[in-house]
């Protein structure tokens, strides 16, 4: 979703949520499949959806949860990999990854960013 910023900024504006309180969850090619990483702020990197969000929120100072989907396999184009279906072991593991991501979000809300980072920013 290369235009994710339209939705994110629209919701933040509608609900009058400052960018620092908008938590973005997104897939990340630079993390191994299933790895979770929480950051309090940062650049968009190479993620087009995050570029859109940064541009339209006008900030990089917002928290985010990155969910690893692994590197693009040889012979694939990034967009085909990102938009494709999970198969094999990854498809089987995906429900557990999503459960851990949901638990991570709950931890951020109930225990705060630092505690969640200490728990979830570990190697998978």
Regions found by a protein language model. Name each.
Residues 1-41, 50-65, 72-77, 84, ...:
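Nucleotide and nucleotide-moiety/phosphate-recognizing core
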Residues 44:
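Conserved TIR/SEFIR loop-to-helix hotspot centered on a Trp-containing motif
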